[in-house]
Amino acid sequence: ACLVGSEMCIRDRSIPTGFTQRATTGMDATLSYYYHYALLSVGSELMAAFETALAPVALSPIAMEAVSLGVSQEQITTFLLPVQSSMHPLYNPDLDYSIYLSQPFFYVLFQILILLITVYIIGSELKFHTAQEWLTTARGNILTAVVGKLLPYTFIFSVIGILANYILYGVLHIPFHGSLLMMNLMTILFIIATQALAVFIFSIFPRIAYIISIVSMVGSLGATLSGVTFPVTSMYPPVHAASYLFPVRHFTEIAQSMLYFDSGFGYYWQSAAILWLFPLVALLILPRLKHWILKDKEELSICEHETPLPRVHNTSHNSIATVIFREWRSISTNAAILLVLMGGIFAYGLLYNLMYAPNLVRKTPVAIVDNSHSALSREYIRLLNATPQASVYALTPNYLEAKEWLKQSKVDGILYLPADFDARVGRGEQSVFTVYASTDAFLNFKNLQEASSRVMLAVNDAHRAEGAVFLPPQGLLAVASSAPVNVSGTALYNYTEGYGSYLIPAVMIIIIFQTLLMVIGMVTGEEAEEFPKGKVVGKHKKLTWLQALYNISGRTFVYVMLYFVFALFLLGLLPHFFSIPNIGNGRDIITMMIPFLLGTSFFGLAASRYFTDSEAPLLMIAFFSVGYIFLSGVSYPLELMPWYWQAAHYVVPAAPAVLAFVKLNSMGGTLADIRPEMITLWIQVIVYFLLSLWVFKKKVFYFRH
């Protein structure tokens, strides 16, 4: 089988020649299947579908032979599968991906927005030297000043959060088992805690250009450490401990308690109490914020007694070399930009790889309700505990006690073995066990599904012979003259079936895209700040088309050369340290990176028309960082998205670049395999180049008299 994107192509040799003859004559027949695991959502669904569909196929030669000899279908089925499983996904029985992601990821994006806006509105007071007036209005009380500043935004954010809850659970009909009133109250508490975290971070070092970069990183890390995609309990212990420094982590635990189990306040009061700690900690650091405000007043007083030097744009646009030199100097002498480059590229890259380094979710805790207390039930429990996917948390004869453990998040599933579990097998009847699994984390659900089904197959193989006494003679003849089909499954492109192996290649491309846009936004925004109309000694004029071309070409040259070096670190070096898939041809990857970096540079320069300062662009770029992964089509098949998201895929260079890089790097594809993505990227290069040329032609630049 060969898989391209989310489509499956089955070659004519997927089922080997002579398979039917070998299977029906009792010879050794093997059926192999392959599933696409470079794209996790596609791969996991295909694997489950293959296992479900091929399980009866494996035993069909025996069943067909037995039925042809007069054995009833029920008799032979009971003999072949004496033990069967019944899987019950809790809360999301259809395993709907949109239900799983919609609620948590709205709040993941929401917390990024709250962090950025809170830092920006407080930082603007210091940046524009109005902080002293702000403090004076509050009569010197820093607590009054901060609360008065943030309260209107708290109200606005609360309205947004409550409206979102109504849309999610009312309009979109996402299943909700808790109290909507309590959910709204916890949403408001989450908003206050997130604002408090932003105040705390800003008070440590209140330089808006630096802090916005740091806060955007904090928000993105919070998205990962919320535990929505990869359970934090499966991360390294220091990373797991660090997750509790993020309000979104505690709110996620609260929301899941109400969403999945209709849990009362007693089940999540600890998470709510921790959210209250964030405002209290912010209170302790407010004196430091006041210190910075008073210090800003002193610095402003000194500046007022100095003779300001006229600021001019001492730049010629008649030489590409001059533009290159100026752009390089602007980047290398700006500490905030260097922080984005060093922090965004190196810290971001290392942290993401470190967080997902465990790669696989192991030992998902499960509670056992054993009402059988038989040798067969003990054998099943022992085999289940021996699997790498599951771990027996505790045994209890009381289902309600196991359900309490599930509500308390001590376990992620319940295995129920009925009282007649062993007796039915002994009577020649089919015995059914039940697995109740939470769907708050799909990886945990997948673990329990795989572990229970594979142990079931092992138990069936071990005890099938005992059921031979219940078969008529012709049934025994069918068993003796036939053989089951050997079924073998192989994960393509991601042999470990790990989450990090799937996600990290896509994240590395997003980091390049996001930080490059940030750099362009900060450089062009700073130019707009430093040379406002009518506030500069000099004259201004618009560029000619040739000068605009020089300007665009020079800037783009700097960005592309700089990010080629960073790409070597992110895409070439890090995969070797963290065992990330890296089977692509280096020349093909470089060929793909050329239109991606060009398109991103032109995209940023075209958008610079709307960059009026060096901080505002960071708000937009950081906010949408999480969404780029979804637009790419690696987390959810692009073909299954609504048309407007499919259209958005072709607008942002990051989306086709992620898909192209995954095909090259993780799947070992060639340039021919990424032809649609390459065409999209080159079209974006042309469109955004022309658009950026027009933008710079219309821009006003200032020159020395």
Predicted regions and their residues:
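Extracytoplasmic/periplasmic domains immediately adjacent to an N-terminal transmembrane anchor
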Residues: 1-99, 300-501, 673, 698, ...
